[in-house]
Amino acid sequence: MILIRKIYRKIKSFLKVNWIKTIYINFKMLSFEQARRLPIVIFGKCSIQSLSGKIIFRSPVEFGMLGLGQRYEVFSKESGKAELNIQGKLIINSKAQFGYDYKIFIDKNAILTLGNMSSMASQAKIICTQNITLGDFCRLGSECQIIDTNFHNLKNVKTHEVFNKSNDIWLGGFNFISNRVSVLGKTVTSDYCIVASNTLLNKDYSSFGENIILGGIPAKLVKENIVRDWETEKENLENYLTIKL
């Protein structure tokens, strides 16, 4: 009976993978030596708009380093709206995950860097037109969006100052960012930062230091000397989120 259950789980996990698009993206974007290991795994439906850019791994390549549409949350039913558009560079330091129904856009000449065990949960949205970096174990909840541009040119009508349309984003390591958080251009967070749900990040918060909670629209310092218990969770997260078929 135990053996049957194990076989059933293996088959179920195998069938969740979109093998056609998994094979396609690996052999389209990587060298043969890297691609044959299938470091990128696509789960479920995914509309691939463009793969004209580059995907770069900064650690030894192995199976399942980047999970796209990976099921690791309480809810696991997708609506099939995942979308991938890579015209710039996607740099992956080690393992990273996106939940189901993600939308990723990397513009020409833009760079999106994902730290080890960084992730965005279901219905995540990234629009990268310049430079976005997620540190190691930077983890964002469902329905978060990271957008480094306002899409339109703005200027001061009195001084005629023209504002940058796009600005870099840096999210530090071991950040715990709750659901429905919006991260906009100019955002910088320190390591070991917690962000409350429904928060708007839009500036440099690094002067507040580490072990803090940010919250509000726009975000402000809510509490100090608070940290997620990463020492307890770190190993469990790596074991739970590593893709095994």
Locate the predicted segments by residue.
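Domain-scale signature associated with acetyltransferase and cell-envelope carbohydrate enzymes
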Residues: 1-147, 168-174, 181, 187, ...
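Histidine-centered active-site/metal-ligand motif
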Residues: 152
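Flexible, solvent-exposed loop segments that connect beta-strands
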Residues: 155-162
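Short, local alpha-helical segments
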Residues: 158, 176-178
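Conserved beta-strand->loop/alpha-helix structural units within folded catalytic cores of enzymes
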Residues: 178-179, 197-198
